[in-house]
Amino acid sequence: MASPNPYSYSPQLPQREESPYQEDQYQSSPSFRSTPFRSSRGTGAGTGIGLGLSSGFTSSLRGGAGGPSEPRSGDGSHDDLPQRSSSSSTVIPSLPPKPKPSSIPETLWSLQIPLHITHQSHPKTPYICSVPRFSYLALLLPRLTAYYGTPCSSFHHEEVHLRNFAVGLLVDLYQPSELPWRLTVADGMEWDICDTFMNSAKEADFIRNGNAKRIMGLSKEHTTALWNAVQDNDYQAFTKINTHLLNAPTALKNVPIRIYIPSSPSPPSSDQQQPQRPGGSSSSGSYRVMQTLVPPRGPNNRTPQTLGQALKSLLPALFPSSRDPVLASVILHGAPVPFSAPLEELMRDASYPDGWLCLIVVLL
């Protein structure tokens, strides 16, 4: 059977309803399943969603907070027993407990972010859904266009035009004060999200190996499967291909890392100061991006380089200590990252699907 073409992917579009609160009807789609959600804003995180603030990044992620609510099991209550209907003696069996993710990457792929989307011409007709943290807003555009009956191609947060970043990265950057995250959709600049993702993945592959032979050597079938796995939020399918990309026959040269630094709301002094700012006149979410080559091992090439060592080397004014956050900390997937974390381990366990570690600087 021929592989699906990622450029021709077009999910079934919903019919517009007049209800003021339209729940996402795509229960069968693993990419945009409408699920319960809970907010867990942690002190100091300021990310709008939380993975739980604990003593370490690993335990924060394994906590799973910020994702869909899961049935309780074995907690001493009777929630796992069959329930009887109040109107009859019929026994209604309860659903089996949902298995918990067994690894950090699997936990990250399971996290969902609730959205409340309105159109400029329909401010009182929201489209409410919950999307995976690793998904992209652009994948919602066909549904929103059909729902509002008008072309939709861009998203805005407080008048700031959002870039085509993963949803989780956008949440960490703009730190919404409450959930669901309220966005506005309109007609405007648009990107081919498949091209955007693949170009970013190729750049990450080049940084890791000094060339992009690993990803360029993928067959058309595997390249299509990689993008389809992101669209479908299919961790298992993604891992089969990503494992090949991460395990090159040569040693890892550099870790693909981008550091997002909050900048002053005043106008930049040069055109190069904010090359990747989303746009708009609002100072909300104003930032600059640092991207440079960061080796996975220290200067002596004997010990793994830690996050703290890299931050002190790249931004000594913000990170004078390589052991503890003094003036600033960094957020990754809604959780603070310990400075002792080895960069290569972070790359393998906590990179976005395109291969990049995206760290958000938070001033203390």
Swiss-Prot record:
Region (Disordered), start-end ranges: 1-103, 262-306
GO cellular component, one term: phagophore
Gly residues bias locations: 43-53
Location(s) in or outside the cell: Preautophagosomal structure membrane
Listed Basic and acidic residues bias regions: 72-82
Posttranslational modification: Conjugated to atg12; which is essential for autophagy.
Biased composition (Low complexity): 28-42, 269-286
One biological process term in Gene Ontology: cellular response to nitrogen starvation
Keyword Acetylation: no
Pfam families xref list: ATG5_HBR, ATG5_UblA, ATG5_UblB
Cross-referenced Gene3D superfamilies: 3.10.20.620, Autophagy protein Apg5, helix rich domain, Phosphatidylinositol 3-kinase Catalytic Subunit, Chain A, domain 1
Keywords assigned: Autophagy, Isopeptide bond, Membrane, Protein transport, Transport, Ubl conjugation
Residues passing through the membrane, by range: none
Amino acid composition bias (Polar residues), ranges on this chain: 1-13
Cross-link Glycyl lysine isopeptide (Lys-Gly) (interchain with G-Cter in ATG12), where in sequence: 202
Membrane protein topology class: Peripheral membrane protein
Assembly with partners or alone: Conjugated with atg12.
PANTHER family: AUTOPHAGY PROTEIN 5 (PTHR13040:SF2)
Sequence similarity: Belongs to the ATG5 family.
Function as written in the Swiss-Prot or TrEMBL entry: Involved in cytoplasm to vacuole transport (Cvt) and autophagic vesicle formation. Autophagy is essential for maintenance of amino acid levels and protein synthesis under nitrogen starvation. Required for selective autophagic degradation of the nucleus (nucleophagy). Also required for mitophagy, which eliminates defective or superfluous mitochondria in order to fulfill cellular energy requirements and prevent excess ROS production.
Protein name from the UniProt record: Autophagy-related protein 5
